[in-house]
């Protein structure tokens, strides 16, 4: 889950504006699309508010949109027109860093891998299962078919939480 140089640049510009709105930056997606790009910002309630079961509101999203729009006008890091979207990460949230997964040990995740794992006919580049543990270099996953994997974090292209209704 390596961030592009452009996403890193945008994160550095946007993070202070998001923090000024009393919410946490979960992640950024940037997709150049011809002459119009898409910038999607995911925000989350601050940890102390999450502990009180508070969540991101539409008002939070609107405030971040307003703040970030102003910052982007000044810094102008995106050439051409762009669409700005601000949202919560949702139940099936994408992980933008390895560190974000630590809070979800014991839950179901979906991984898209750079290189296939497994043996013979069971080789796969996608894996879904229970996240058993994660450390600085790898994670352990029990796939939905019961197979156990240790996967290098550097082999993960994309990771998402899979929401399961309790």
From Swiss-Prot:
Its main location: cytoplasm. The keyword Zinc does not apply. InterPro entries: Ribosome_maturation_RimP, RimP_C, RimP_C_sf, RimP_N, RimP_N_sf. Pfam families: DUF150_C, RimP_N. GO terms for cellular component: cytosol. NCBIfam families: PRK14631.1 (NF011224). This is Ribosome maturation factor RimP. It comes from Psychrobacter cryohalolentis (strain ATCC BAA-1226 / DSM 17306 / VKM B-2378 / K5). The lineage of its organism: Bacteria, Pseudomonadati, Pseudomonadota, Gammaproteobacteria, Moraxellales.
């Amino acid at each position: 889950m390596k961030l592009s140089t452009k996403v890193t640049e945008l994160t550095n510009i946007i993070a202070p504006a998001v923090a000024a709105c009393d919410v946490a930056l979960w992640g950024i997606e940037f997709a150049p699309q011809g002459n119009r790009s898409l910038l999607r910002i995911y925000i989350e309630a601050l940890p102390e508010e999450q502990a009180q079961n508070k969540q991101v509101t539409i008002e939070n999203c609107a405030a971040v949109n307003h703040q970030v729009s102003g910052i982007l006008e000044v810094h102008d890091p995106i050439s051409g027109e762009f669409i700005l979207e601000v949202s919560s990460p949702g139940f099936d949230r994408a992980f933008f860093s390895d560190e974000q997964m630590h809070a979800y040990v014991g839950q179901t995740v979906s991984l898209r891998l750079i290189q296939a794992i497994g043996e013979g006919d069971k080789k796969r580049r996608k894996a879904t299962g229970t996240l058993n543990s994660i450390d600085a270099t790898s994670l352990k996953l029990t796939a939905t078919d019961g197979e156990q994997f240790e996967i290098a974090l550097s082999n993960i292209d994309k990771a998402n939480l899979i929401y399961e209704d309790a």
